[in-house]
Regions:
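Core nucleotide-handling region used for phosphoryl-transfer chemistry
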Residues: 1-215
Length: 215
């Protein structure tokens, strides 16, 4: 059944998985394997998770984490303001966090609402950032240096390194954490593939961010 209220008009059926990134702490059994893989580290931003997709007929659909939303919803209006709907082609989906005033206490103190794209899909297959449509990388979550944030040492070492991360979105403001997106063409063990699913990513949350914001 559809939840009452809001602008939900149907179930989530975009050509992608629902956004999800397990915490690294739940993947300790795969840490040695993860350290052999190439991954793009990106800043995790705290907003409202939204998916925009184009079906085979060229119709654009917008979704919250679990539901399709009305085409007049504020999520769609913001996506259109940034012309994300014009960047898609049939069978494609873009996933982004909507951030700014009035959303999640606007902890990054952004001056206006905006999207931060974190994943793009074509026919249920997540694609690397260098394959994204023109214009979309300009609206992406910040990418961090792959060498500086290479997966090394122990899980605890990595968690400690992320603790206190700040200033990658808004000067001097604590960042929520880091999400590592595995490059698409790598072979994963069956166990790790099952843990990550088609999203093929995982996160470390910044403990200082949680503490400061009472989360």
């Amino acid at each position: 059944p559809l939840p009452m209220g809001g602008a939900q008009i149907g179930r989530f059926d975009a050509p992608c998985s629902k956004s999800d990134a397990p915490r690294l702490q739940t993947l300790t059994g795969y840490w040695d394997e993860l350290k052999t893989l190439e991954a793009v580290p990106t800043v995790k931003v705290d907003g409202t998770s939204t998916t925009l997709s184009m079906d085979e007929r060229g119709q654009v659909h917008v979704y919250s984490r679990n539901w399709e939303l009305d085409s007049m919803s504020s999520n769609m209006q913001l996506a259109k303001r940034f012309q994300l709907d014009k960047m898609l082609w049939p069978g494609m989906a873009a996933q982004f966090e909507l951030c700014g005033p009035g959303i999640q206490s606007n902890r990054l103190k952004l001056p206006a609402q905006r999207p931060f794209v974190f994943a793009v899909w074509k026919d249920h297959h997540k694609i690397d950032r260098d394959q994204w449509p023109t214009g979309m990388p300009n609206l992406a979550v910040p990418e961090l240096d792959e060498n500086e944030w290479a997966l090394t040492g122990s899980v605890d070492d990595m968690i400690a390194k992320v603790d206190g991360l700040r200033g990658n979105v808004t000067k001097d403001r604590l960042d929520e954490g880091i999400v590592w997106h595995l490059h698409e063409d790598q072979q994963l063990s069956e166990g790790l593939a099952n843990e990550l699913g088609a999203n093929r990513c995982f996160k470390i949350i910044n403990n200082k961010y949680l503490t400061k914001n009472g989360l």
